[in-house]
Structure formats: C-alpha cells, structure tokens
C-alpha cells in the first residue's frame, strides 16, 4: 500500500487566557491562530484521498471566533451566560491546542474510515511563536 503525507494550513480567530500564568497572558486576549498539519496514511482506494482537506478545515474551525478557557477557570461560568466557551483540561496554550487538534483529527481519520494519522502539527499564536507536536 502506498503511503502519502498531506499538508493543510487553517487559520482561525479565538480568545483565550492562561489561568496559571503570571504575566499579561493571564488576561483574556485574542489571537489570529494558524494551524499547520501533516497527516500520513494510505489513500482511499476508490477516491485516492488520504483525508479530504475540507474535513481538516472543519475540525480546526470549531475554534473560530470562540473563547477557549481552562475548565477550572472561574471565568467560564460568567462568560457562558453570554457566549459559549470551549474548555480544556489545562491552560489552553498553543502546546495543548496542538495536542487537542491532533487528537481530533486522528478521530476524524477513523470516522472517515481511512488508515491515516497526524504526524506533525504546528499551532501558531503569533507570526513568530508556535508549538509543534511531532508523533
């Protein structure tokens, strides 16, 4: 079976804060996030696609224009009265978002019935700062 590595870049806007950080990132603030993802696997024998790029974008875009907070953050309850909040098990750093998105994309591969997985993902929170998860 042939193995192919595909790449997709997706951007989204979202706010977050780091509950356990001492410094300005403890305040609620927003970013123009960029996600770069590499997925490796065997293409579907019928359509020759590893995973549809639109499916990758859809998984990442669930964060677009959202507020992302640590599930232990006391701000969650106050903000949820006005706007939905995506919560994470820990502070929503670029490092943690890389793991969450990679896991979500791996689940999407399984859901699509393709033998593929994320091998590398970068989550950029600014033009000069990113976290890269390599598996």
Task: Provide a role label for each language-model segment.
Residues 1-135:
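Charge-rich, low-complexity N-terminal segments
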């Amino acid at each position: 079976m042939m193995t192919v590595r595909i790449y997709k870049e997706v951007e989204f806007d979202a706010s977050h804060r780091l509950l356990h950080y001492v410094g300005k990132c403890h305040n609620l603030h927003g970013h123009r996030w960029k996600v770069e993802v590499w997925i490796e696997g065997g293409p579907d024998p019928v359509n020759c696609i590893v995973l549809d790029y639109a499916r990758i974008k859809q998984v990442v875009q669930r964060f677009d224009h959202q507020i992302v907070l640590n599930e232990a953050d006391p701000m969650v309850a106050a903000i949820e009265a006005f706007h939905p909040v995506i919560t994470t098990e820990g502070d929503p750093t670029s490092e943690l978002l890389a793991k969450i998105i990679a896991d979500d994309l791996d689940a999407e591969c399984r859901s699509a019935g393709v033998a593929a997985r994320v091998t590398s993902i970068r989550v950029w929170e600014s033009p000069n700062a990113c976290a890269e998860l390599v598996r």
